Amino acid sequence: MKNTILILFTAFIALLGFFGMSAEALADPKADPLAGPNPDADPEAINLKAIAALVKKLLG
């Protein structure tokens, strides 16, 4: 049961990261992808990305 919950949680975090990056790309399609995130493009997408990174860091 614990492994199932861990797998589902990891999949959820991965989807958050994927859709967060997609939303950021849609909000600012002409931005240089190597320049990093644009804080003016879509702050909510950047926050989801930051939350996903924090959870990944906490889980190891």
From Swiss-Prot:
Positions bearing Leucine amide: 59
Keywords: Amidation, Antibiotic, Antimicrobial, Fungicide, Immunity, Innate immunity, Repeat, Secreted, Signal
Major localization listed first in the record, in broad terms: secreted
Ranges of the AXPX repeats in the UniProt entry: 27-30, 31-34, 35-38, 41-44
Annotated propeptide span(s): 28-45
One Gene Ontology term from the biological process aspect of the record: defense response to fungus
GO terms under cellular component: extracellular region
Signal among keywords: yes
Tissue specificity annotation: Expressed by the venom gland.
Signal peptide: 1-27
Compartment list: Secreted
Domain of life: Eukaryota
Function: The synthetic peptide shows antimicrobial activities against Gram-negative bacteria (but not against all strains tested), Gram-positive bacteria (all strains tested) and the fungi C.albicans and C.parapsilosis. Exhibits little hemolytic activity against washed human erythrocytes.
Family statement drawn from the similarity comment of this UniProt entry: Belongs to the MCD family. Mastoparan subfamily.
Name of the molecule in the record: Mastoparan-VT6
Organism taxonomic ancestry: Eukaryota, Metazoa, Ecdysozoa, Arthropoda, Hexapoda
